[in-house]
Curated annotation (Swiss-Prot):
It comes from Tupaia glis. The lineage of its organism: Eukaryota, Metazoa, Chordata, Craniata, Vertebrata. This is Apolipoprotein C-I. The gene is APOC1. One of its GO terms (biological process) is negative regulation of very-low-density lipoprotein particle clearance. It is found in: Secreted. It comes from the Eukaryota.
Length: 88
């Protein structure tokens, strides 16, 4: 009984899977893809530029660069003092 019920379900599932894509779902041809490429690249470049500018402005406004510079200065000073004490 289960086999009789599962066979029609299997056939319907296979027919849906093996069905050709509808014309609206078909992949666009290569020439139409190339026509829209410059616009998409320009939009991508503008978006990337805006995001980069925002990130740079956020870094400039934060105190992270000053903290990093101070940390490197202090650490370098400690290392320099350690070398002077060790090798003098």
């Amino acid at each position: 009984m289960r086999l009789l019920l599962s066979l029609p379900v299997l056939l319907v599932a296979l027919s849906v899977v093996l069905e050709r894509p509808a014309p609206a779902q078909a992949a666009p041809d290569f020439s139409s893809t190339l026509e829209g490429l410059p616009d998409k690249l320009k939009e991508f470049g503008n978006t990337l530029e805006d995001k980069a500018k925002k990130a740079i402005e956020r870094i400039k406004q934060s105190d992270l660069p000053a903290k990093t510079r101070n940390w490197f200065t202090e650490t370098f000073g400690k290392v320099r003092d350690t070398f002077k004490a060790t090798f003098s």
